[in-house]
Amino acid sequence: MDRGISAVRKAMAPLLEYERQLVLELLDSDGLVVCARGLGADRLLYHFLRLHCHPACLVLVLNTQPAEEEYFINQLKIEGVEHLPRRVTNEITSNSRYEVYTQGGIIFATSRILVVDFLTDRIPSDLITGILVYRAHRIIESCQEAFILRLFRQKNKRGFIKAFTDNAVAFDTGFCHVERVMRNLFVRKLYLWPRFHVAVNSFLEQHKPEVVEIHVSMTPAMLSIQTAILDILNACLKELKCHNPSLEVEDLSLENALGKPFDKTIRHYLDPLWHQLGAKTKSLVQDLKILRTLLQYLSQYDCVTFLNLLESLRATEKVFGQNSGWLFLDASTSMFVNARARVYRVPDVKLNKKAKMSESAEGQETKKELVLESNPKWEALSEVLKEIEAENKESEALGGPGQVLICASDDRTCCQLRDYLTAGAEAFLLRLYRKTFEKDSKAEEVWVNLRKGDGPKRTMKSDKRPKDTKNKERASTKKGAPKRKKRELTLTQVMGTAEEPPEEGAAEEDQQRQATSSPEGCGGEIQHEAFDLNLSSDSAYGILKEPLTIIHPLVGCSDPYALTRVLHEVEPRYVVLYDAELTFVRQLEIYRASRPGKPLRVYFLIYGGSTEEQRYLTALRKEKEAFEKLIREKASMVVPEEREGRDETNLDLARGTVSTDAPADTRKAGGQEHNGTQPSIVVDMREFRSELPSLIHRRGIDIEPVTLEVGDYILTPELCVERKSVSDLIGSLNSGRLYSQCLAMSRYYRRPVLLIEFDAGKPFSLAPRGSFFQEMSSSDVSSKLTLLTLHFPRLRLLWCPSPHATAELFEELKQNKPQPDAATAMAITADSETLPESDKYNPGPQDFVLKMPGINAKNCHSLMNHVKNIAELASLSQERLTSILGHAGNAKQLYDFLHTAYADVVSGGRVRK
């Protein structure tokens, strides 16, 4: 019973020796900590949270996710901390947030809320003890977190700033990236802790786990497919270089193409000119993505799933683009032939008759013989589990059987492993084949009959090695009796179900459903919740006395700490890494070092000489090179004394853009500086999700955050700005929302402005490349903008290439202009009856008149200047309307509309019918 309770309520392990050394250095001086992936950046952050969980402190935490905040709070609760961290969200009203801050402790708050509270002085800046920043590599100049840190340093010179990140590769891009991040963080010290650090390496080597590397050989068909995909990938890369010579040749190597960040690298180079690229280049980028997916499916999933993906890609030609030619390469033919050979084979007699290749598909399917090649890793996993089971039978010296944790890359792989361990490879693949290719029922019968035959006949019918057949038999034999005896201890725990073992029919239906279900079916979060549920009853605690096997995904869980929880709650003695993942490998090293004296064996399954192995080694190499570059930058880095901003000498804290080279106007008071009112802009609360308010504040303009119904930025009492990104602009034009917004701005402000802001790093073009049509189209963005400006003559369009340019433009528009009033801006709503004095028309009748035939935005004001109300309008003659509107056709339409009898309209409609 005690053992079960300790498994559930397991606190985070104490700091290791090198971690304590780093904490002492960080306590002595603020700085940025860059450690290797998996070496415990979250553990360091948790320790500082633990130190400041006291009402006498007020510490803000930036850049954390809700799941991470929940994990930290639960860990502190387990340790018995009384003053737990609190989360400030939109559910807490703005008036009550000041009380939350003054109660002290740790505060998790969104960046938007903190920015608004700093600007409105709702947070006691002078009482803040310090700020902890997580994922510090994301702190660029224009982001919200950098804005918060700048506001904090302007108002508080004593508080600490400590930043943590485990992504050293992120600092490998751009010029002096780490120095710019430290500048935005206001820290002087850089703490680098790679895996090859002397203190880290020496300590972990003393407590390293027992590692068993198993290099699994791919089948000949898999090797042929991998070679074919790599050849096609290399050909596509060469063609991409030919079409785009400006691309970096080093980044477009075949080795980099195997890594996870390759898609981001390609888009980083091509996004700024994406709208200028031809169809061939865009098609090649899509092909590279598909080929990388094929490589992943080859090593990750079974032969049926891989063939299904290939066939679906060939059937859907639009996936490859119009000009893709790699489908006609010899390597592509080899890939399709070998992929089909892994699933089924056609008798040689059939293949030799080339004249009959045009027969119907049904005739071919009747003579297919299923092969259903098993994944080699499955058999290796069965051997590992068999070895663990044998050791557990003789584990009295170690205190009983050890628990087993199997880690695969994603939920889908976990589901397949569970079904394989439940039913065996043959039954699982046959069931999956039936579900995927339902029309091949006759081929299934042939395969089933072959399996019922004798052993030699099976060997001759299949091209696989006899060793593979024996391994399959061993795997199915191994899973025979123990599978039934320990079903509750393995499979139900894997899927997180606390039900009775189902009957055979129900179990088969469930396995069929899970085999091809969506990845959400085996989520780590569901598994963990069910694991806690199983431990909640007294009878369930006894489960831990028997070998427990859990299959868990490495990535893709909604809870990023689900695997960490399972690791510390189950405390497995054996961990099987079905897929290689650098972060979790390091996490296992920390786990072993924090439990001295307790055995841990790690089985490392990997395809030898495969792209999977190459990806893992490339990730190791890139991280090592990134740390070496950071070490060189740190050695040559020049950090000014005022970097931390603890006095007024730091220029980064200065606001305004007045240059010493700017000429003074000597006609006004001899060039003396004019001490006028401080410029300000009223900003809508929702705009604080963007980086523009930060840049406006940086230019010396005060920001008043309020909730606006009309406009996003009020620059002057007469000038209102509605900001739109390109995607938002297109969506608002299509939905008609932009028309309503422009109507409201035109009605209540003399100078309405539509600001279209596009990112310089993203593609944007109003007209397609090489084509421009004179005729207007209802679906064209340019046409819709033209109609918008025709309908609202006072509306002005501003085009800005970046938020920095927008902030500069706002500053120029505000020069020598009166400041807006926040209360007045808040009082203006879309349904407000109060109008500026310059507008002398009621909006209701004006909208009504605009909907009449013959009335448009050009002649509407002329008509309203001559007519007081609708009754007077109805009394005018057609000649008088012609003189007012200036157009006989419009006057006739309006006159007929006003004076035609309803009965005539109805009768006329019947005649037309």
Swiss-Prot record:
Protein location: Nucleus; Chromosome
Residues that bear N6-acetyllysine: K289
Keyword Manganese in annotation: no
Region spans: Nuclease: 655-810
Modified residues (Phosphoserine): S518
Entries under InterPro entries matching the protein: ERCC4_domain, Restrct_endonuc-II-like, RuvA_2-like, XPF, XPF_nuclease
Cofactor(s), by name: Mg(2+)
Pfam families: ERCC4
Enzyme class: hydrolase
Region (Helicase-like): 1-454
Single GO MF descriptor: single-stranded DNA binding
Segments for region (HhH2, dimerization with ERCC1): 834-902
Coiled coil: none
NCBIfam families cross-referenced by the UniProt entry: rad1
Listed name of the protein: DNA repair endonuclease XPF
Protein source organism: Cricetulus griseus (Chinese hamster)
Protein encoded by which gene: ERCC4
